[in-house]
Amino acid sequence: MDQSNRYARLDLKEADLIAGGRHVLCAYVMKPKAGYGYLETAAHFAAESSTGTNVEVSTTDDFTRGVDALVYEIDPEKEIMKIAYPVELFDRNIIDGRAMLCSFLTLTIGNNQGMGDVEYAKMHDFYVPPCYLRLFDGPSMNIADMWRVLGRDVRNGGMVVGTIIKPKLGLRPKPFADACHEFWLGGDFIKNDEPQGNQTFAPLKETIRLVADAMKRAQDETGEAKLFSANITADDHYEMVARGEYILETFGENADHVAFLVDGYVTGPAAITTARRQFPRQFLHYHRAGHGAVTSPQSMRGYTAFVLSKMARLQGASGIHTGTMGYGKMEGEAADKIMAYMLTDEAAEGPFYRQDWLGLKATTPIISGGMNALRLPGFFDNLGHSNVIQTSGGGAFGHLDGGTAGAKSLRQSHEAWMAGVDLVTYAREHRELARAFESFPADADKFYPGWRDRLQRAA
């Protein structure tokens, strides 16, 4: 059934919809299946996403028609489809009237993903009007709070030197805590890897007790504050809260040095909101493991990593992994830096829409995946700043001299970039950085041709 006479209004102007402030706008790349017209399929998509179905129903009235989602722009050649969703469509809490991200997803990327006349459809951007934006929690904490704990400038404190304890599984509590202590002697921040929790060989309560002790010892030995991101991911809201409360109690006076990691993609919006609301004084670390199933450029359905990041800021993530923008081992490219800008800036341009965040606190980009001291300068050159949390697993513990030296090499790489000094030149007077060249020779040869001769001449 062609529903374009009801669910398509190509006379509507995007600027007018934004000025009106009553619609969430979504931009998709959509292709109909063979034999279906573009506008007809787009209208069916909008109907299925809002008030319609595949037939006219007798219960529809004038009010219902007033909250139809409307296709307002199409470009069949580029496969671009834009839809305006009235804000009245979205579900709100009965306890406080706040917005729910699950409702946003249910409408904009729900049943429409399984429609028989759609070959594929993927959301590439969305715009949230002020009246709806203000109903989301947004972050309560971000990197500025970490800088405060670390004793740095809270406006431009620079890279937080971090790691992920590897191997991601298989370490018992004491070896895990020992690895934490080793890294903390040179670095700032350690995160649980996403599957680490309460395995039978590494009970959470035992591991956390030992990690809290390792933090105290490292702080005493270095005179510097240290940070830990503990995984509280669980299916059950009560389990998440129980883990969080135990962790804070165990860290005691260092409770404000603790972030909570939640696997936000696999657990969904409910887990992120649980952590945000139950623990507003903790940095909420959004890990996105599994997201590539829908965000990868190879996947033509779902939504992009940019959209995932934007949703994370709405929900209240203090930080979210953003990949390495082509500078590490994970899928990505240099142009992905717009994702970081959308997380951190007061207003930012997306692929299709400019979003004003109206004072909503920034979300911190977390950089991980194949990074080491030699790759950092190029990454920072592309991004334009270094106000990120950077976590290197192999880049720290793959250092020939161990985790402490690996941490120091990462810090020295950042220092060199901040000073505008060539990395090989800086390495001549910084042993840990020099040894990073020997630790990662393939990267050294790729990014710094002739490094061996230059370092040997300095020696």
UniProtKB/Swiss-Prot annotation:
Example GO biological process: reductive pentose-phosphate cycle
Source superkingdom: Bacteria
Binding site for Mg(2+): K191, D193, E194
InterPro entries: RuBisCO, RuBisCo_large_chain_AS, RuBisCO_lsu_C, RuBisCO_lsu_C_sf, RuBisCO_lsu_fd_N, RuBisCO_lsu_N_sf, RuBisCO_lsuII
Modification sites for N6-carboxylysine: K191
Cofactor binding, note field: Binds 1 Mg(2+) ion per subunit.
Subunit structure: Homodimer.
Comment field (misc): The basic functional RuBisCO is composed of a large chain homodimer in a 'head-to-tail' conformation. In contrast to form I RuBisCO, the form II RuBisCO are composed solely of large subunits.
Family note: Belongs to the RuBisCO large chain family. Type II subfamily.
Protein's name according to its UniProt entry: Ribulose bisphosphate carboxylase
Organism: Cereibacter sphaeroides (strain ATCC 17029 / ATH 2.4.9)
Lineage, top ranks: Bacteria, Pseudomonadati, Pseudomonadota, Alphaproteobacteria, Rhodobacterales
